[in-house]
Amino acid sequence: MFDAAHRLERYKGKCEKLHGHTYRVRVTVVGTPDEEGMVIDFVELKQLVNEKVLALLDHSYLNEIMPQPTAENIARWIWDRLEPVLKTEKRRLYEVTVWETADSFVSYRGEGHEGRTESEGQ
């Protein structure tokens, strides 16, 4: 999880104003388990996510890090930072999911795949 502020430029609505969220991130890696029976050690995965993503995004102003920081663009930004360091002969990054609220999230699976946005109404 990380806390950050942003605003959506060129957007007509309340999100064009400066506001913040507590974002939740899920990173999914697929591949062939190693001799220990793991696709990737949770310790290694958490360390990479902390170093490459959370250390940069937590308590930041996202507009200074990426253009138009929608949940979709945040997921893609995270993908672009993690995909090269997670890819090996036996594993690869499969999906990045970002929750902007408890019931609104997006998933990204890289270039050539459609993104997915979901929200549960209340």
Summary of predicted features, one role per range:
Residues 1-122:
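Charge-rich, low-complexity N-terminal segments
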